[in-house]
Amino acid sequence: MTLPLETIRLPHLPSALPVHIALYRDVNNSPFLRQQLLSGNADFEYAFIDASMVFSRSHILSAIFRAVNDHLNGRLKSRNVHSEIVFSLSPANNIADSFRKFGITDSTTDLLVVKVSVTPDVTHASVATHLQQYIEGSPVPFADETLSEISDISKIKKAYKLGTLGSRDDEKRRLELSLIGAIALRGAT
């Protein structure tokens, strides 16, 4: 099966910093992947995100933009741009809490993987090969339709402390705008 790794160049950011994103279902080696992160294995410097906590492409792309922008401007609050992506998803300023709520856990089965090309040797091909070798799960398209099947709306609302957001038809759009607003406003002075 072809790996649906998507490479995105975000507007307003240097084209030399493309972002590689892949989405997986039925991942069965999350404990291994998490341990690689915890041990600081540089080969596994990715943002490993529990996909059930991602509402839409816009939601995660907003967090990525914020993290990469902070990276470029020397404002990282975490170890690297990849951990900053996970931290940027959180509406709070507690790094450990953001990893508990949004990062990979030993029980994660739906995984969103993000890699920023911070060095020239990080290419679409190198990321695709590495993920294919180490992620034991089924790659699926990184699309709003897929994310809507995976997203746990009640967990997301709880993490962002959001209640009812209006009529059923309007609720999804309001939720997405609330999530993006929370990412934009966190840490603003």
Swiss-Prot record:
A single cellular component GO annotation: chromosome, telomeric region
Cysteine disulfide links: none
Principal place of residence: nucleus
Keywords, sorted A to Z: Activator, Chromosome, Nucleus, Telomere, Transcription, Transcription regulation, tRNA processing
Record localization: Nucleus; Chromosome, Telomere
InterPro entries xref list: CGI121/TPRKB (IPR013926), CGI121/TPRKB_sf (IPR036504)
Domain of life of the source: Eukaryota
Pfam families: CGI-121
Coiled-coil intervals, chain numbering: none
Gene Ontology BP, a term: tRNA threonylcarbamoyladenosine modification
Subunit structure: Component of the EKC/KEOPS complex composed of at least bud32, cgi121, gon7, kae1 and pcc1; the whole complex dimerizes.
Record function comment: Component of the EKC/KEOPS complex that is required for the formation of a threonylcarbamoyl group on adenosine at position 37 (t(6)A37) in tRNAs that read codons beginning with adenine. The complex is probably involved in the transfer of the threonylcarbamoyl moiety of threonylcarbamoyl-AMP (TC-AMP) to the N6 group of A37. Cgi121 acts as an allosteric effector that regulates the t(6)A activity of the complex. The EKC/KEOPS complex also promotes both telomere uncapping and telomere elongation. The complex is required for efficient recruitment of transcriptional coactivators.
PANTHER family: CGI-121 FAMILY MEMBER, EKC_KEOPS COMPLEX SUBUNIT TPRKB
Entry similarity comment: Belongs to the CGI121/TPRKB family.
Protein name in the entry: EKC/KEOPS complex subunit cgi121
Underlying gene: cgi121
